[in-house]
Amino acid sequence: MKKNWILLLLLTFSLASLSAQDALYPNTFPLGDVRITAGPFKHACDLNVKVLLQYDTDRLLAPFLREAGLPKKAETYGNWEKDGLDGHIGGHYLTALAIHYAATGNLECKKRMDYMVSEFARVQQANGDGSICGFPNSKKFTEEIRKGNVGIVWNYWVAWYNMHKTYAGLRDAWLYGKNEKAKKIFLKFCDWGVDVISNLDDRQMERMLDNEFGGMNEVYADAWQMTGNPKYLDTAKRFSHKQIFDSMARRIDNLDNKHANTQVPKAVGYQRVAELNSKTAPDYNDFMTAAEFFWETVVSHRSLSLGGNSRGEHFPEAGKCSDYMHERQGPESCNTNNMLKLTEGLFRMHPKVEYADFYERAMYNHILSTQHPEHGGYVYFTPACPSHYRVYSAPGKAMWCCVGTGMENHGKYGQFIYTHDTADNALYVNLFIPSELNWKEKKIKIVQETDFPNEEGTTLTVNPSKATQFKLLIRYPSWVEQGKMQVVCNGVDYAKSAQPGSYIAID
């Protein structure tokens, strides 16, 4: 591709101030306020809705009903859903329904989402203690953890990781799907978790967290933001595995040969704690540094050009990237899903082009390609091994972890195209994707028309319904050469003195 980029703006607005967004994630537009209008990302999202609706909701709920002693309405799925990780896809599926309802307005997604929330309420009530678990012998697990027998985690297939998917699904049904019942269930589930680990000392917590636990620190940070209750912040910090956290906070890379997608969600949690913590808190800098250094380390030293990382699910030793050439299990899709979450979070705090550049690279080259463009199956591994190939899932047959994140991925493409900064009264254009933004607080609609990457340009049209004021910031990608970017508005090129890897401002 020629390194030449032209962006035309049709602006007819006068210029006031932004009201704060009432959202879990600051400076992020509600997913339903951004519509992708054409191109491969719209195709992927629309196709994914069709794939999601091929799954049987009752079969996904069956493990939870079984563990609560309730009659099943259908048989559970096979594969990983019957091998000890029972229920993990149910949480992912709830998130996916909520996201795709927000992204497309599909009412069947909403109907299924609301049904799952109601069923989880039944499960929680039947359990009587606030828990919602789908993995076998879950009550025994809880009893042993309460007694301090944390070694029990090794007798289960990543139980806390599994539960995290349900936590996240309930949070997302509230966040994206506007289901208030889901929030109540989520917080009650959080209270159960606080109670279960309440008698564990720091040594026991560390032993327990040696086993994969997903993003438990992330969801407890979210619970803290929802409620302001400090017990959730305390729990988020307790779920921040010190073995990784302490090294990252000291800017020490200790990731060699560690299971990659065990580590990435931890860093997502570090970022959430830093984002929500007071900058005057004594541990603020540690959480911030841990999140930033983890991102820098993985992106700059442990990722391939497509934005993915890991071989055989583990980070190779530093300097041994040749391992990728001999391993059929290349970068794992789940890892990139979580790296994009981390990138979004860091960008919310410090909107740097390097974050947007990585996001674009990983989304186009890895995440988009993990969906089969015809039947919509999902990919686990993307091998870099010469002459190798990828395997795509079939609905209801393969129930891998990357099926779960794959269900979610293709509804979130609109989440990072545009962001805003309330303090700076600014709108960021981060990605060049045909789309429409309904900026309700400003009473403005913004239309982006482009066929990127098949054409080297995009057009933004700003249509205000009232006089308003804001700063428009357009990404100058690092891959565009110096002097080759043009941002033309009313005949004026605002990019003349701009540098690659920056944002071009129109005030």
Predicted regions span which residues?
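Glycan-recognition and catalytic cores of secretory/periplasmic carbohydrate-active enzymes
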Residues: 21-507
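Bacterial Sec-dependent N-terminal signal peptides
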Residues: 1-22
